[in-house]
Amino acid sequence: MKILPAALAVGMLSLAACSSQTKDTTTSATGDPVGLKAVVINDALPYSTKNGDAWTGLDVDVLKAIQKEQSEENATTELSYVEVGSVSEAKDALTSGTANIVCGVGFSWKRSRQINYTLPFAVGGMRLLTTEGVDGTPESMKGKQIGVITGSIPANLVESQLPEADAKGFDSPDAALKALKDGEIATIAGGALWSKANMAEVPGSRMVPVRPYGRAGVGCAVTHGNDALLASGNLAIGQLLQGYIDGDEESTRIINSSIGSDSPVGLEADKIAAYYNSVLGTVAGIGKDE
């Protein structure tokens, strides 16, 4: 099953048309494209991690795909990274204009008032990474301490879904994971893919419950007004998803090395492809004649 590039582009651009129609800030007054300034957090597998001076992870590969898409549409677009240490710093970077895009973020209706989301390239939700004999249900977590990343969607889900648990805040995913490794805390709440990617770092740990709380798509987000950047992001992500479905070598490498069979997450290829088909089916026709 294939989506013709033209049909895919129409679907992606129609998404941007549904976003806010405010001033487009992806080009300067001279018409030159504004560089991609991406928020990144270190040690946030499978999305982003820093090795020396180089960033790797699913977010980085997606950002490079968006950079390539923008460079094909305009002149060469530069990609730079704005490293932050907490969710609050990430929000500040976006609202201040220091950064104009962030990837690896779960969809939230509340946050959609401030930012526009691209197509998702993964699906997440909140799961608990724990060394205790709990099953992750509200009953089993009564009175239990749960580490959360302050300001994150999982932190909000702990508050709403596990109200009788005792939430302990950490500034970053790395700080929460370190506390779990050191035995400072027995359970932390994180994105489902993040929890799976880091489970091997904590001997004897497991993920609960079986089904995540607050299951939602994971993609990139830009501030309102960046309509052309949103369109480029949607087109690049759509092509990445379609490439994976069609067995494109580079698309398959990107996805499998981050969340597929070649990664600690280990999602099955047919399940990834089924999800990507469902995503693309909402924005462009997929059929034998296309």
Name these PLM-found stretches.
Residues N42-L45, D53-E72, G106-F107, V123-K181, ...:
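Bilobed "Venus flytrap"/periplasmic-binding protein-like clamshell domains
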Residues A75-S140, R206-M207, R211-Y213, L280-G287:
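Acidic, polar ligand-binding/catalytic clefts
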Residues S14-A17:
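C-terminal motif of bacterial Sec signal peptides marking the signal peptidase cleavage site
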Residues M1-A7:
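Bacterial N-terminal signal peptides that target proteins for export
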Residues I41-D43, A122-E132, K196-G238, I259-I286:
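Periplasmic-binding protein-like
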Residues S19, G57-Q70, V134, S140-Q145, ...:
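Extended ligand-binding regions for polar small-molecule ligands
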Residues S19-W55, D135, E139-Q145, Y275-E290:
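Immediate post-signal peptide segment of exported/extracytoplasmic ligand-binding proteins
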